[in-house]
Amino acid sequence: GEVVTITYPGYKPWSKKLSINAGDILKIPEIELVPADSIVDLSTMPSGATITINGEYRGNTPNTVYLDADKKHNISIFLNGYFTQKHSVLLASGKRKNLSLELIPSIGAVKVLVSPKDSTIWIDGKLLGITGEILQLPSRPHLMEIKNSGYVSYKKVITPQPQLEQIIKVQLLTKEEHYWASIPVEITSLGGQILKLFKPEGTFTMGAPRQEVGRRANEVLRKVKITRPFYLATKEVTNDQYWQYKQHSSRHAGGKTLDRPKQPVVSISWEQAALYCNWLSRKEKLLPFYIESANKITGSNISATGYRLPTEAEWAWAARSSGSDNQSENLHNNFPPKDKSGNFADISAANILESVIPIYNDGHSTTATVGSFNPNKKGLYDLDGNVAEWVNDYYGIRFNLGNTAEIDPMGPNEGELKVIRGGSWRHSDIAQLRLSFRDTGNSARDDVGFRVARYVESKDKKSR
């Protein structure tokens, strides 16, 4: 077969492949030629604009488009940051038109206010000004970057709006500030505990003055400064959280169960609490804080960021409503406390305990569900009651001679007893319910539990 093509001025070519045997006659029906298209060559400055014809997408500039002849066609040209251009064309068959357009920028005003004021503003990689200047920019997306020596650069995609001045305010952060802005202020452990981030500033005083009512000899005044930010659980570890680690019974007191899922776990030793912390660390693939050997705690790695018990200094700082208060918020200048302000030895426990707070009723004769009472000003629950709490430190009495603050104290390196802090459902005396009260022990008690803590970063991490 051969391809046969018929052409005629002003009409589209007609082509068809024809096959015929020798000696045969092939009859072809009458051929009606179709008028040729009109042609439009489209270009824009800048190029890359979108073309629509009669609402239908026809590519981007530069482009050549073919249109039905002798018909009106509506051409629209779009490009981000430029005004839309619209044109109508009507061309005879076979006619060609060149349409070259210079697009008009659509401008929006942007005022960028930055602290510090000597910061420079870069748009799409080009330096355009300093803070406070009004930038006139095409109304399309731009990458804005703000730079200043000693600060982390700020990047943001902005889209100016025509006839509308935008005001953008930016506070640049130092590397240190940027780092801490990226650290979550609250985390949830795989054990179910919610922990809050704390970054204590300045120094505070542990202990109590000699004249304070209820003060004991081991509450020596000492200045302390905590420099390592840490996470601290908002609530005490519950029975059901501890059961994830191992089987355990918190038992009962006076015929009342201490073993409900949301009651704080009790009747565990300091070592059992530390082993739980290591289990939780391994569960989250964190370096354990406590050193173990044959299921015994033999030491600690103070550079580790795994879970641990709070240090006595951390506990004391977290429990205070201010830097110097030695009484809980519930008991400050108010003893006996108001009803249901915390879980202490109340009249509902009179059949269980020898001593209770007269005319005080918190509604719980033994341990309460954790978080049953209002938190302190730092958002922490039950620091002054419910159960007393194991802390990390060995017990000791340290005299702070002079005016120098101890930095991140962790207690003696060794000892026989561990420190217990906070009041409990068994405590009725104001001496035991003050925040400076220090108890000691090693063995399990039915009014002692714990809460978990962890450092944010290792001790040897270099400053940013």
Where are the regions a protein language model picked out?
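Short, well-ordered beta-strand elements within core beta-sheets of diverse protein domains
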Residues: 229-234, 265, 307, 368-372
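Short coil/loop residues immediately preceding or within conserved phosphate-binding loops
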Residues: 37, 107, 132, 141, ...
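Surface-exposed aromatic
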Residues: 257-266
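Short loop/turn and low-complexity linker motifs enriched in small/turn-promoting residues
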Residues: 1-193
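A short glycine-rich, aromatic-capped structural motif
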Residues: 183-253, 266-281, 318, 385, ...
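Short, polar loop/linker segments at the starts of domains and inter-domain junctions
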Residues: 55-62, 125-132, 206-227, 355, ...
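Functional-site microenvironments in short loops/helix caps that host divalent-cation chemistry
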Residues: 205, 209-214, 259, 270-438, ...
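Short, structured beta-strand segments at or near domain termini in extracellular proteins/domains
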Residues: 446-464
